[in-house]
From Swiss-Prot:
Keywords: Aminoacyl-tRNA synthetase, ATP-binding, Cytoplasm, Ligase, Metal-binding, Nucleotide-binding, Protein biosynthesis, RNA-binding, tRNA-binding, Zinc. Zn(2+) binds at C334, H385, H511. This is Threonine--tRNA ligase. GO terms for biological process: threonyl-tRNA aminoacylation. One of its GO terms (cellular component) is cytosol. InterPro entries: aa-tRNA-synt_IIb, aa-tRNA-synth_II, aa-tRNA-synth_II/BPL/LPL, Anticodon-bd, Anticodon-bd_dom_sf, Beta-grasp_dom_sf, TGS, TGS-like. It is an enzyme of class 6 (ligase). The gene is thrS.
Length: 642
């Protein structure tokens, strides 16, 4: 009979099989009431599942991350329960958990309107408030199939036929008259599922295949309590205000259009930000001793076959042909960098060789996945590849890590989560090589005092990698930086160097990206700063304005002086009220507005005002220029007098 070991090391002995709920009841009624599921020997199970042998057990409640995921998954079933009551002929497809919520794909003979979604949410609340028990039954494959055939659930039948073995016992979850199929676990009672909201609907092909029927996908969010739900909805509201697509239009940064899906039309001000970002990255490339190169954006398909990209990536590659040869527009820069490395004999004395490129890449992303600057088809990578010996890996990774944090800190990103992905089952190279490589990455992180978590088995077949995920002011995660070891590509493309022993050796290649896609990073920055870019990045840093025509000459002189000092400046001499001009440029998020009236002309000064509405008073022109230059040069996130 089972001995149950709890997380604190204490044990409970039973003379019969017990469920996590039984153990929770044994500990106390308060814990039992809070119990959502259990983790038995590291595996999540339903609160009602029986434990027959000795096991470790952790009780899962709404305070646990897994508990929240289970609540969300059960809310997807609740959605199914409600939609079948409102529209009984609906066919249910799949309803998984996603970030912050859930969705359900449904086959419905009507297009859901906003009023329909509101009615659906209302019915979900009515059902949840009944606090009914969710009943789990493990049944044979044949019984499960018969259940869903009788109910006309063709998609569930297809899942059974195509994805579930005949000797398996699927779990059927009964929500009163509604039945759904799932691995689980799910909440034992609907009292855990009171805090949710349906968010939107979208189209989705069955199994993600455009040859299949288009279904309707209903998205929802769910949380453990009302406070968390409201906080999330508030964050969404703030995120909507910061949406880079909206701000990009307001500030005239860029646009997209149907004739070039996923391709960016940069306007002058947006391109100014792009170029300033390039200047910043180039300064870091120089500091960390990289050489900058430029490869062709299109190469023969034969090369992509050698690299393995054609076999594994061809659906995402744009192709063209000329003179009976097929070419691929590059989706990444690494093969081109190996070609540059291969020009001329390389010695161990030439290593490490650090090669960087602002590489223009194209990937044939599905049109439905495109999203402003965040998901595009044409993008520029701040890409680099380091060719080195195995002995140099640790030092090079160390330098990459320092560079990542150096660059992120410039933008004020302080919360960075780091993950180290280790060897997968299918891989090249010896265990000894992987041992050394993984240890080198781990030690490099430790030497920089960076906490990290392992992602076991998540590395590429050709080497382990470090991923850097930064969190913005709304606590949203953006995976941008990567340091990836590659023991395969140099060999595939015949890269070599002459070692100290005069023998030919294959270099190790380190793929290194920090910002990732420049376009996406500008989208992230736009939302992080809500368009209030730090002065060094702002397209227009200063606007000089007159109050009446009599100050026009002074404004022009001052504008020229600022321009000569390397400051991006515009003069606004329009015959408009000064309040109107200030408001307009404030809405344009121009960092500084310099106002010139008769008093300023007479004193050779200028009245300085920030876009946040702070009046810095009347200041000496040369002092203002000097302070602005210092702010821009230091890439400060703070404005004058902040």
């Amino acid at each position: 009979m089972p001995v149950i070991t709890l997380p604190d090391g204490s044990q409970r002995h039973y003379d019969h099989p017990v469920s996590p709920m039984d153990v929770a009841l044994d500990i106390g009624p308060g814990l039992a009431k809070a119990t959502i599921a259990g983790r038995v020997n590291g595996e999540l199970v339903d609160a009602c599942d029986l434990i027959e042998n000795d096991a470790t057990l952790a009780i899962i409640t709404a305070k646990d991350e897994e508990g929240l995921e289970i609540i969300r998954h059960s809310c997807a079933h609740l959605l199914g329960h409600a939609i079948k009551q409102l529209w009984p002929h609906t066919k249910m497809a799949i309803g998984p958990v996603v970030d912050n919520g859930f969705y359900y794909d449904v086959d419905l003979d009507r297009t859901l309107t906003q009023e329909d979604v509101e009615a659906l949410e209302k019915r979900m609340h009515e059902l949840a408030e009944k606090n009914y028990d969710v009943i789990k039954k493990k049944v044979s494959w044949h019984d499960a199939r018969e259940t869903f055939v009788k109910r006309g659930e063709t998609y569930k039948v297809a899942i059974l036929d195509e994805n579930i073995a005949h000797d398996d016992k699927p779990g059927l979850y009964h929500h009163e008259e509604y039945v759904d199929m799932c691995r689980g676990p799910h909440v034992p009672n609907m009292r855990f599922c009171h805090h949710f909201k349906l968010m939107k609907t979208a189209g989705a092909y069955w199994r993600g295949d455009s040859n299949n029927k288009m279904l309707q996908r209903i998205y929802g969010t769910a949380w453990a309590d009302k406070k968390a739900l409201n906080a999330y909805l508030q964050r969404l509201e703030e995120a909507a205000k910061r949406d880079h697509r909206k701000i990009g239009k307001q500030l005239d940064l860029y646009h997209m259009q149907e004739e070039a899906p996923g391709m960016v039309f940069w306007h002058n001000d947006g391109w100014t930000i792009f170029r300033e970002l390039e200047v910043f990255v180039r300064s870091k490339l120089k500091e960390y001793q990289y050489q900058e190169v430029k490869g062709p954006f299109m190469m023969d398909r034969v090369l992509w076959e050698k690299t393995g990209h054609w076999d594994n990536y061809k659906d995402a590659m744009f192709t063209t042909s000329s003179e009976n040869r097929e070419y691929c527009i590059k989706p990444m820069n690494c093969p081109g960098h190996v070609q540059i490395f291969n020009q001329g004999l390389k010695s161990y004395r030439d290593l490490p060789l650090r090669m960087a490129e602002f590489g223009s890449c194209h990937r044939n992303e599905p049109s439905g996945a495109l999203h402003g600057l965040m998901r595009v088809r044409g993008f520029t990578q701040d890409d680099a590849h380091i060719f080195c010996t195995e002995e140099q890996i640790r030092d090079e990774v160390n330098a990459c890590i320092r560079m990542v944090y150096d660059m992120y800190s410039t933008f004020g990103f302080e919360k960075i989560v780091v993950k180290l992905s280790t060897r997968p089952d299918k891989r090249i190279g010896s265990d000894e090589m992987w041992d050394r490589a993984e240890a080198d990455l781990a030690v490099a992180l430790e030497e920089n005092n960076i906490p990290f978590e392992y992602q076991l088995g998540e590395g590429a077949f050709y080497g382990p990698k470090i991923e850097f995920t930064l969190y913005d002011c709304l606590d949203r995660a953006w995976q941008c930086g990567t340091v990836q070891l590659d023991f395969s590509l140099p060999s595939r493309l015949s890269a070599s160097y002459v070692g100290e022993d005069n023998e030919r050796k294959v270099p190790v290649m380190i793929h290194r990206a920090i910002l990732g896609s420049m376009e996406r990073f500008i989208g992230i920055l736009t939302e992080e700063f809500a368009g209030f870019f730090p002065t060094w990045l702002a397209p227009v840093q200063v606007v000089v304005m007159n109050i009446t025509d009599s100050q026009s000459e002074y404004v022009n002189e001052l504008t020229q002086k600022l321009q000569n000092a390397g400051i991006r400046v515009k003069a606004d001499l329009r015959n408009e009220k000064i309040g109107f001009k200030i408001r307009e440029h404030t809405l344009r998020r121009v960092p500084y507005m310099l106002v010139c009236g008769d008093k300023e002309v007479e004193a050779g000064k200028v009245a300085v005002r920030t876009r946040r509405g702070k009046d810095l008073g009347s200041l000496d022109v040369n002092d203002v220029i000097e302070k602005l230059q210092q702010e821009i040069r230091s890439r400060s996130l703070q404005q004058l007098e902040e």
